[in-house]
Design a protein with these regions (language model features):
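Intrinsic-disorder-associated, low-complexity terminal segments enriched in Asp/Asn/His/Tyr and depleted
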Residues: 2-4, 13
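Ser/Thr/Pro/Gly-rich low-complexity, intrinsically disordered segments
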Residues: 6, 19-22
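Short, positively charged and aromatic/hydrophobic N-terminal segments
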Residues: 10, 16-17, 34, 38
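Short, composition-biased linear "edge" segments at structural boundaries
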Residues: 17-19, 207
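Ferredoxin-type iron-sulfur electron-transfer modules and their immediate structural context
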Residues: 22-164
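Beta1-alpha1 glycine-rich phosphate/pyrophosphate-binding loop at the start
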Residues: 27-50, 79-91, 100-102, 129, ...
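Short hydrophobic/charged patches on amphipathic alpha-helices used for structural packing
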Residues: 61, 241-242
Length: 248
């Protein structure tokens, strides 16, 4: 019995000392980690998919067969004018390519990065079964990024004569409908509960997949159409439907 007690006491002392040392050590690690974070800049994750150069984009665009009945267009949920913008890109007409994309898409720099192209436009390309499908998403992304950098397209603000529209939420659906309505002459206000617009684009997709700066740049283009954003505004708590109507 005495021997067993001695063993138990030894084990108790061992684990007690271990726990104290572990807690002390962890406190030291956490303190060092906190100090390290204060002194070092935050890590920035690069995109996993690199963009084309101008020469690469034009070369890829020239592979398009410009089909008479483009199946790629049928595979696109918004029926983007894919062969048309690729044709303009193949000739180096970036402004024309961007104007064609804008006819259907309000968020091309985002769609060019996160859309499941293999299941949609690119997956319907006649060259896809042979493993040589046109990289439609990367081409769309290239044109959109080129436009952002070079400021090729700056649309005229249409006169807001068709009334007011409230959009609840500034996720991809809210941004898209706001852009479409603004182009048609409606005065659009987006009510967003978060401190920054974007919804799932801003808060739900990791930086290496969709950089926050890209989302912000696309939102700036929507805002440039005359769309107003009301942030930190929770509809249903801070405002109800009657309050919105009371604002006109």
């Amino acid at each position: 019995r005495n021997k067993n007690k001695l063993i138990l006491l030894s084990l108790w002392h061992f684990f007690t000392n271990f726990a104290v040392q572990y807690e002390t050590g962890m406190q030291g690690i956490l303190a060092c980690d906190k100090l390290d974070k204060m002194n070092k800049p935050k890590a920035v994750f690069r995109e996993i998919n690199e963009s084309y150069t101008l020469q690469e984009a034009i070369a890829e665009a020239k592979r398009c067969l410009n089909c008479k009945n483009p199946s790629c267009k049928k595979g696109c949920p918004i029926e983007n004018h894919i062969p048309e913008f690729i044709h303009e890109l193949s000739k180096g007409n970036m402004g024309n390519a961007m104007a064609i994309i804008n006819e259907k898409s309000n968020l091309p720099a985002i769609c060019g990065r996160v859309c499941p192209h293999e299941k949609q436009c690119q997956g319907h390309c006649v060259l896809y079964p042979k493993g040589k499908g046109i990289e439609i998403g990367k081409l769309e992304r290239f044109v959109a990024d080129f436009d952002t950098e070079m400021k090729l397209i700056r649309e005229k603000l249409p006169q807001k004569t068709r009334g007011k529209v409230a959009v609840i939420g500034s996720g991809p659906a809210g941004l898209t409908v706001a852009g479409d309505l603004a182009r048609q002459g409606f005065n659009v206000t987006i009510f967003e509960s978060q401190a920054e617009p974007g919804g799932v684009l801003m808060y739900g997709i990791p930086e290496y997949r969709l950089p926050k700066q890209v989302v912000r740049q696309e939102i700036e283009k929507i805002e440039a159409l005359g769309v107003t954003f009301l942030l930190n505004c929770v509809v249903g708590k801070q405002l109800n439907i009657d309050d919105i109507f009371a604002q006109g």
